[in-house]
Amino acid sequence: DLNGITEKLNYIKDMGFTAIWLNPFYESSYRDGGYDVTDFYKVGKRYGTNADFKRLCTIAHQKGIKICVDLVAGHTSLECEWFKKSCCTEKNEYTNRYVWTDNWLNIYNGECIGGYAQRNGAYMKNFFYCQPALNYGFANIDEPSWQLPPEHPDRRETKRELINIMEYWITLGADGFRVDLAASLIKNDYDGRAIIKFWREIRTIFDEKYPECVLISEWSHPSQAIAAGFHIDFLIHAVFPAYTSLFRAEDERDVPRIFFGNSFFDTRGNGNIETFLNDYLDEYEKTKDRGFISIPTGNHDLARISYGRTNTELEVIFAFIMTMPGIPFVYYGDEIGMEYIPDMPSKEGGFTRTGSRTPMQ
């Protein structure tokens, strides 16, 4: 819980870390590890209270440690009051807060779920069925009867609410945000121009009001993310094979099973550095002196970096991560070689990811 983190701040400080990214701690239905939020303005009871968060920030700042909040910008829980009101047949302020088609049978290429509410429409999901997509608009409209442009007043209101959430946690002491699925908010945005404009506008606001606030993206395309105003982007598995080619290309290590091959940091010597360099060097040159690329040890979605590795391999991997240009992120427990536990029963939507989400070993 939050008070437990506060108690361990000296441990984090003694290792030399200067910031903490917290996974979602909001009130949630916990069908996807807290990434299905029911109340963006309230700490979940299992983690403490808003006052506990404020205390954590205060004490962390005294120790020279910044606190970054996980901003789940693209969706909520089905149990969120916003979504419950959006399900109503009567028009209200939340009618267009989420993406709905114009007919319960129109599931839009399988991206939407019909038959859930009395409302005659199908809601768009972002990942699991329990994560209805907030409506930030469509950059390219192919069904004008229900798709709205990003400039529509209702879309601007959704964006205004997102900014309100960010400002609320800043007032309690937050120093920045890691934005979940940052590139996916505006739909049918094939070249990324609309979402870049969206985040650039937010960055402009925050530069004026909160110039020390850091914005970190789960975009996986640093040149686009930094052009959008983010300070840091993770070069991970979502767009390029570069990250996976370093550590997790083998079938048994790549738990999401997106890319296949051989890792460079594998003592069997079957991998190569070219796959990584082809992507990394291009992104590095495009972002140099404008923002930072992060090569993390892992996160809540990946098998732990220690999985199937020797301590010698891990020492070399950490030396690489800690000396590369950019901002290193260390997933909790990786600093002690914490192990991934395969075939664990799924917990709160973790599935194969559950083995990376265990308590400190």
Which residue ranges define each predicted feature?
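Alpha-helix termination/capping residues and helix-transition junctions
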Residues: D14, T171-G173, T287, T323-M324
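Residue-level detector of family-conserved "landmark" positions at structurally sensitive sites
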Residues: L22, D70-L71, V179, Y331-Y332, ...
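Residue-level marker of motif borders
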Residues: I65, G121-Y123, D175, S294-P296, ...
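A Trp-anchored, charged/polar loop motif used as the substrate-binding/catalytic surface
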Residues: D154-I165, W169, N270-L281
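Short hydrophobic/charged patches on amphipathic alpha-helices used for structural packing
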Residues: T6-L9, M166, F318
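Active-site groove signature of glycoside hydrolases
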Residues: I163-N188, R290, S294-L302
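Conserved alpha/beta catalytic core and glycan-binding cleft of carbohydrate-active enzymes
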Residues: L78-G110, W199, R203-P359
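Acidic/aromatic-lined carbohydrate-recognition and catalytic surfaces
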Residues: D1-R160, T171, A182-G229, A238, ...
